[in-house]
Amino acid sequence: MGISMGKSMLVLLTFLAFASCCIAAYRPSETLCGGELVDTLQFVCGDRGFYFSRPASRVSRRSRGIVEECCFRSCDLALLETYCATPAKSERDVSASLAVLPDNFPRYPVGKFFQYDTWRQSTQRLRR
């Protein structure tokens, strides 16, 4: 009861195809250059945007940009994220800038023409 040469070759090729797929899927990093690097950064960073060199606070002794990091060497997702810009505060995100007025804060208008009656009288004088 032997296995034919064709079946054993088919099993071997199937195993090799499966193994190569798994190894490629678990490869942690790859080289990215040119438009592929820019597209990947846009995908990773999204609306935040990105820098081609790291911000000054994250620079090591030897300053390298993302091209040196990812095109000439392999880079992973964590390294790509270090080049993302910090998100800008949106106009709708005002929770930190809201000032709470005390209950005893005066609520009367301050200024010459803030009171409606004063403004109305001035307007009537101009019409005359």
From Swiss-Prot:
UniProt-recorded Gene Ontology molecular function terms: growth factor activity; hormone activity; insulin-like growth factor receptor binding; integrin binding; protein serine/threonine kinase activator activity
Region: A, residue numbers: 65-85
Alphabetized UniProt keyword annotations: Carbohydrate metabolism, Cleavage on pair of basic residues, Disulfide bond, Glucose metabolism, Growth factor, Hormone, Mitogen, Osteogenesis, Secreted, Signal
GO biological process: embryonic placenta development; embryonic placenta morphogenesis; glucose metabolic process; in utero embryonic development; negative regulation of muscle cell differentiation; negative regulation of transcription by RNA polymerase II; ossification; positive regulation of activated T cell proliferation
Annotated S-S bridges: C33-C71, C45-C84, C70-C75
Chain positions covered by the region annotation B: 25-52
Post-translational modification as stated in the protein's UniProt record: Proteolytically processed by PCSK4, proIGF2 is cleaved at Arg-128 and Arg-92 to generate big-IGF2 and mature IGF2.
Miscellaneous comment as given in the Swiss-Prot or TrEMBL entry: The IGF2 locus is imprinted. Paternal inherited gene is expressed, while the maternal inherited gene is imprinted, hence silenced.
This protein's name: Insulin-like growth factor 2
